[in-house]
C-alpha cells in the first residue's frame, strides 16, 4: 500500500472535530469519492452509520458532497457495517459508505467504503479519491445534482438475510441467550434475529444515546455480559462491537470465548458437515492453541498480518472460506463478504444446537496456550529489532520453547512501542521468557 495522507487500512478515521473528521473535509471527501465513482459509472450510493452522535453531522456532509458530484445517496439509518455491505450488493449500488469508528469511543468516527460486490474498495480507487481531494471542489449543473432517499425497512431486510444463514431445519427454541450490542448498530438487529429463531433473549447494551457506544460494554469489555449470563443462568452470551463486525462470546460458566475459539468451532463444524473448503486463516496474534487444535483435526492453518483486511486477502489468495482475528473479526465467505458478528454468532449457535453441546464443551477440543504481551517503550534512534543481542536472545527463547510455543516481536503502528509476545504451555515459563526479551529490548532502545 502506497503512502497515503488520509486513508488507512480501514478507511478514514480520527477524532471528531479534528482533520480529517470535520464537516468541511467530509463534504469534500464525499465530492471526491463521487467524482471518482462517477467515472466508473456510479450513480447510486448506500450510506449507513453506527449510533455515534456525530453520525448525523457527517451523514449530511457526505450527502452534500456526493450530490455536488452528481451522485444520489440512499440512507439506511443506524446499521451494522456488514449490513451496509450486504445492502450495497442487493441494491446493485455502485458503492456503500459506512460512518463508524468500530470499537473506538464515541468521540472518534470514520468513513469507510465498500465496492459494488460488498468488499472494501480496491487500493487504486482509494488512491484516486485521495488525488481528487487535492483539486478544487466544483458542482455539477443543477439538473445533474444527486438526490437523497431512505431505504424502507433496511433493518428488516438485513434481519431476514442473517436468519437465512441459520439452517431452516433447526431452531433456537429452549436456549436462553444474553446479547450485548455495545449500544451500537446491532441494537435493533441481533435481539430480533435471535428471538425470531426461537431463543429467549435478554438484551443489554441496547439503549444507545449517541455517546455510550462501546462504553464498558460489547466485544471490547465483556464483564457486564459475563455477570449477566451467570445471573440469568443463560446458556450463552454474545457481544458485538459498535459497528457489529466483531463477535466475542461467553459460555454458561462465564468464560470468555474469543475469535480464535470461534474460528475453531466453525472450522470443526464445517469439517464434520463436509462443508469445509481448504483451511482456516488466522493472524500473527492467533493463539498457538488454535494452530495445534486445527492440526489435530487435519485442517490447514495460515497466519496473515494483523487486520481483517489482510485475513481476507490471504483467504482469497488461498481460496479458503473462513478466517478470523482473536479480537472477534470472523469472515465467512460462504455466508457474506466481510466480517459479520451476527452471522458468525449464528454459525456457533448452529453447532450448539446440531451437536446438543454447550459452548463450553465445543471449546474443549482447543487448549489456549498462556500468552503474555509486554509493551516496551523506546525513545532512542536505534531500532531495537535490529539489535544483535535482542535477536540472539529471541533465538535462544525460541530454542527453549522447542516448537511448543511462539515468539513475536513487532512495532506498534501508532506509538513508539515494541510489542513482545511469547506463548507456550506453562504460564510461569512464558512470563519469564517474555521478560527476558523485554529487558533486552529496553536495553537496546
Curated annotation (Swiss-Prot):
**What's a GO cellular component annotated to this UniProt protein?**
cytosol
**Cofactor(s) essential for the protein:** Mg(2+)
Protein known as = Phosphoglucosamine mutase
Q: Which family does it belong to?
A: Belongs to the phosphohexose mutase family.
Mention any Pfam family matching this sequence. Answer: PGM_PMM_II
Summarize the protein's role.
Catalyzes the conversion of glucosamine-6-phosphate to glucosamine-1-phosphate.
Signal sequence, renumbered to the chain = none
- Which GO MF terms does the UniProt record name? magnesium ion binding; phosphoglucosamine mutase activity; phosphomannomutase activity
Q: Do you know which InterPro entries this protein is assigned to?
A: A-D-PHexomutase_a/b/a-I, A-D-PHexomutase_a/b/a-I/II/III, A-D-PHexomutase_a/b/a-II, A-D-PHexomutase_a/b/a-III, A-D-PHexomutase_C, A-D-PHexomutase_C_sf, A-D-PHexomutase_CS, Alpha-D-phosphohexomutase_SF
Bound cofactor: record note: Binds 1 Mg(2+) ion per subunit.
Q: Quick one: which gene encodes this? A: glmM
- Tell me the NCBIfam families matching this sequence: glmM (TIGR01455), PRK10887.1 (NF008139)
Source organism: Pectobacterium carotovorum subsp. carotovorum (strain PC1)
Q: Which residues bind Mg(2+)?
A: 102, 241, 243, 245
Where Phosphoserine occurs, the residues are 102
Top EC group: isomerase
Q: One of this protein's GO BP terms?
A: carbohydrate metabolic process
Listed A to Z, the keywords are:
Isomerase, Magnesium, Metal-binding, Phosphoprotein
Indicate the residues that form the catalytic site.
Answer: 102
Amino acid at each position: 500500500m502506497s503512502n497515503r495522507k488520509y486513508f488507512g487500512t480501514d478507511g478514514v478515521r480520527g477524532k471528531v472535530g479534528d482533520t480529517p473528521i470535520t464537516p468541511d473535509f467530509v463534504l469534500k471527501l464525499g465530492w471526491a469519492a463521487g467524482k471518482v465513482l462517477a467515472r466508473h459509472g456510479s450513480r447510486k450510493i448506500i450510506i449507513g452509520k453506527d449510533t455515534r452522535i456525530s453520525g448525523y453531522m457527517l451523514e449530511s456532509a457526505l450527502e452534500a458532497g456526493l450530490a455536488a458530484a452528481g451522485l444520489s445517496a440512499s440512507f439506511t439509518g443506524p446499521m451494522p457495517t456488514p449490513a451496509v455491505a450486504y445492502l450495497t450488493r442487493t441494491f446493485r449500488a455502485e458503492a456503500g459508505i459506512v460512518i463508524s469508528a468500530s470499537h473506538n469511543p464515541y468521540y472518534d468516527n470514520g468513513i469507510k467504503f465498500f465496492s459494488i460486490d460488498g468488499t472494501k474498495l480496491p487500493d487504486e480507487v482509494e488512491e484516486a479519491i485521495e488525488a481528487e481531494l487535492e483539486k478544487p471542489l466544483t458542482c455539477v449543473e443543477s439538473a445533474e445534482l444527486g438526490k437523497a432517499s431512505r431505504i424502507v425497512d433496511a433493518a428488516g431486510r438485513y434481519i431476514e438475510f442473517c436468519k437465512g444463514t441459520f439452517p431452516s431445519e433447526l431452531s433456537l427454541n429452549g436456549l436462553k441467550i444474553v446479547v450485548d450490542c455495545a449500544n451500537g448498530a446491532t441494537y435493533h438487529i441481533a435481539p430480533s434475529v435471535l428471538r425470531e429463531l426461537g431463543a429467549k433473549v435478554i438484551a443489554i447494551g441496547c439503549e444507545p444515546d449517541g455517546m455510550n457506544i462501546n462504553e464498558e460494554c460489547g466485544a471490547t469489555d465483556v464483564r457486564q455480559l459475563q455477570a449477566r449470563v451467570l445471573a440469568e443462568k443463560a446458556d450463552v452470551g454474545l457481544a458485538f462491537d459498535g459497528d457489529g463486525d466483531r463477535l466475542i462470546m461467553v459460555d454458561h460458566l462465564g468464560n470468555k470465548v474469543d475469535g480464535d475459539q470461534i474460528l475453531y468451532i466453525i472450522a470443526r463444524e464445517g469439517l464434520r458437515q463436509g462443508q469445509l473448503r481448504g483451511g482456516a486463516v488466522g493472524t500473527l496474534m492467533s493463539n498457538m492453541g488454535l494452530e495445534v487444535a486445527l492440526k489435530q483435526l487435519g485442517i490447514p492453518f495460515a497466519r496473515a498480518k494483523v487486520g481483517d483486511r489482510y485475513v481476507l486477502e490471504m483467504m482469497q489468495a488461498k481460496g479458503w472460506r473462513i478466517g478470523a482475528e482473536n479480537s472477534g473479526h470472523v469472515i465467512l465467505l460462504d455466508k457474506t463478504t466481510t466480517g459479520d458478528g451476527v452471522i458468525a454468532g449464528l454459525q456457533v449457535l448452529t453447532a450448539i444446537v446440531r451437536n446438543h453441546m454447550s459452548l463450553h464443551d465445543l471449546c474443549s477440543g482447543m487448549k489456549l496456550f498462556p500468552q503474555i504481551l509486554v509493551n516496551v517503550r523506546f525513545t532512542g534512534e536505534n531500532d531495537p529489532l535490529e539489535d544483535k543481542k535482542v535477536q540472539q536472545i529471541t533465538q535462544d527463547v525460541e530454542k527453549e520453547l522447542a516448537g511448543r510455543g511462539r515468539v513475536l516481536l513487532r512495532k506498534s503502528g501508532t506509538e513508539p512501542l515494541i510489542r513482545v509476545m511469547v506463548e507456550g504451555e506453562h504460564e510461569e515459563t512464558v512470563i519469564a521468557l517474555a521478560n527476558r526479551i523485554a529487558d533486552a529490548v529496553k536495553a537496546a532502545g
